[in-house]
Amino acid sequence: MAEDISLCLDRLGFHKFSICGHSLGGKVAMRLACDFPKAVDQLIVVDIAPRTYPAEHHLPTLTALLDLELSKIESRKEADHALTEKIPNWAFRQFLLTNLEMKNGVLTWLPNLQILRRSIQFLSANPLQSTDQFSGPSLFIRGGKSGYVRNEHFQEIKKYFPEAQIETL
């Protein structure tokens, strides 16, 4: 994915750029900065650290979304109600439901959930190798209530991104 972005930006005439990514996009942005350090002017990573996360954490959510019988559901409100038992956190459900789209009168998921479930081990892995490093300006932004970027991750972040600043919202 990082190489695809680099090729696309190069074709569009962007030879020096800043990149910002959230979650999986943050992993791609980190990989891009390490692979193409001369092209990346600044790196901003939101709510993810350069580490492996437990893939099992996401499987119940993906299963709940895949088990939803969208052919019998007519609105996001109905989908929200149907997911309440398996995904009790209201705010998280609302976030997930932003990926639900009405196409020709039928609700469909924007992401390919089957591919996400099959690829979850790969997607949860640390995108960087032990020798990777980006020495340019880097900002890691974390949510105050999020568990994805914890204080104990700071040393690991600094290993890969020695100029990194970490901010909490």
Q: Which positions does each model-derived feature cover?
A:
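Active-site loop/oxyanion-hole signature of alpha/beta-hydrolase fold enzymes
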Residues: 1-20
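Active-site acidic short loop of glycosyltransferases
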Residues: 13-16, 37-38, 135-136, 163
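Gly/Ala-rich beta-loop-alpha elbow adjacent to hydrolase catalytic centers
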Residues: 21-25, 29
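Flexible "cap/lid" loop of the alpha/beta hydrolase fold
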Residues: 30-75
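Conserved alpha/beta-hydrolase catalytic His-Asp/Glu region
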Residues: 56, 71-126
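Conserved serine/cysteine hydrolase catalytic core
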Residues: 104-161, 165-168
